[in-house]
């Protein structure tokens, strides 16, 4: 009997790629069958994913529908939990929110987050700042949550300083080692982890080659040159990088170093290809010429919130990174410029950045006058960039150096590529999503004025413009004084900024907005009540006049409004008044008695005559007017008092009408 072998194969990357694909579908809104409302935010997700990750959702979805509202958790915390469910990672959570995150994880039944406090309690510091001195690493079996705690050793042995263990990733990291480089920063009052600060670096005219300034890169396939980066956990949801020219560094030659730190550096080289999602931000500007293999310098006094993660695909021994301690106590001029800040939402994290050199060549980091680091995507990565939301042509302001700033303002261009899984509110503080209709369709509001509802907007440097084929589906909404223009799939809707009612006609919205502004007032002619709309006043005056305009065609009875007439037709005649056959007649409003007249010539000595029934007719010139008509002096100008006939014992009310407006009332029956 012939023996046969049974072959089994396991794809160790399948679970990660599957989870990444589900996260991308969530970002695009594909196949999402549940909406979770937390505070004022809506989160689209999949029931199967949430129920499999949370015992709370597993029990809730057995009885709940497609819309679920959570009142016991904040939106910021739920966004972190949802990102963990779809990425198996917790990314850059502030330490003051950690207790609330763990408590929310216990309420939702997310086991990993609920028991996250056990391994974290064994770490001496969670701030992420490097400290001098020896620290003991955690035992590999502490906390059975498959939590990987890595301790990196400095490649430069002359430093001799070790760095405390840093929690980098959670769950399986088989055949993957992440390279991290820790920047020791000085104390800073700014504790906002969601803001990234970079320094404005002027190009040096002369550079001296030294061991401290050269990143030696071997000519292996796919080498990677890495400049000043700090560790930060990356999230599958693409973030928005905040780059702010806040510091200015002097340009002596001896200060141009690769990394200016007061402590040791932390390097962790990747030994296997890592799967990266399209969480890339491209910032392309015309770089200044820099000698090869010489990287630019960064200041040694940087805010503690600078955290950049580099995840590179490379072969073993493909990159040799050299970094030593630089000169200490160098003078720096710190310039705060908040106007050039591109802020991000609290949910955002720092994007994955990498420098891509050419094959068999060396590549260095280059900076322009406004310190926009050139970051490109590795060509060997398979990333579906066609599913990304591209926002380009963001004009930057002039930097402190007018010559350099104006040059790159004309020549440079920043292209920001955002995956649609990001929170669109992270584009700026004033942005707000009003519609997410269809696949990969996002409509954003950029307020012009500062108001408490919409936040503070900086239109001069933050209004993006869509590019390419996405121009048809993704458009920006412009805010006016009284409304938003919401563009969805080519159709324009005008949304009132006060009550959020939508209109398809701008004139209808203008008339509606008078309810909030009261620019025009329509007082009742019979009492002291005032109305913001003319139709409101007309409906009210019907009760004074008792006029019955709605007449039933079946029996001839008249009614004061449509509701009474409709109930009469249904109950007495057993008919539907809103059907195809018209069962009632709407008579014109006779209380105003508007004259119907033809064109008047200047030679006419009379005005159109009016009978008692309110029907007017033209009076020929030179003929006697009929009995009951009034005459006027020749060449008398026509006024509103001539058109409207005053009722007996009624006082004349003269309304203050603004210039350019009329007093005609358009009565629309309720059945229309």
Curated annotation (Swiss-Prot):
Organs and tissues of expression: Expressed in vascular endothelium.
Modification Phosphothreonine, positions: 251
Upregulation: Induced in vascular endothelium by wounding. This effect is potentiated by prior laminar shear stress, which enhances wound closure.
Region ranges (Required for DNA-binding): 514-638
Record domain BTB: where: 32-94
Cell compartment(s), UniProt: Nucleus; Cytoplasm
Zinc finger (C2H2-type): 494-516, 522-544, 550-573
Region entry Interaction with NCOR1, spans: 1-103
Motif Nuclear localization signal location, chain numbering: 471-480
GO cellular component terms listed in the entry, alphabetical order: chromatin; cytosol; nucleolus; nucleoplasm; nucleus; plasma membrane
Domain of life: Eukaryota
GO molecular function: DNA-binding transcription factor activity, RNA polymerase II-specific; DNA-binding transcription repressor activity, RNA polymerase II-specific; methyl-CpG binding; RNA polymerase II cis-regulatory region sequence-specific DNA binding; sequence-specific DNA binding; sequence-specific double-stranded DNA binding; zinc ion binding
Residue numbers spanned by region Interaction with CTNND1: 454-672
Biased composition (Acidic residues): 328-341
Keywords for the protein's UniProt record, in alphabetical order: Activator, Cytoplasm, DNA-binding, Isopeptide bond, Metal-binding, Nucleus, Phosphoprotein, Repeat, Repressor, Transcription, Transcription regulation, Ubl conjugation, Wnt signaling pathway, Zinc, Zinc-finger
Signal sequence extent: none
PANTHER family the UniProt entry points to: AGAP004733-PA, TRANSCRIPTIONAL REGULATOR KAISO
Job description of the protein: Transcriptional regulator with bimodal DNA-binding specificity. Binds to methylated CpG dinucleotides in the consensus sequence 5'-CGCG-3' and also binds to the non-methylated consensus sequence 5'-CTGCNA-3' also known as the consensus kaiso binding site (KBS). Recruits the N-CoR repressor complex to promote histone deacetylation and the formation of repressive chromatin structures in target gene promoters. May contribute to the repression of target genes of the Wnt signaling pathway. May also activate transcription of a subset of target genes by the recruitment of CTNND2.
Subunit structure: Self-associates. Interacts with CTNND2. Interacts with CTNND1, and this interaction inhibits binding to both methylated and non-methylated DNA. Interacts with NCOR1. Interacts with KPNA2/RCH1, which may mediate nuclear import of this protein. Interacts with CBFA2T3.
Protein name as it appears in the record: Transcriptional regulator Kaiso
Annotated source species: Homo sapiens (Human)
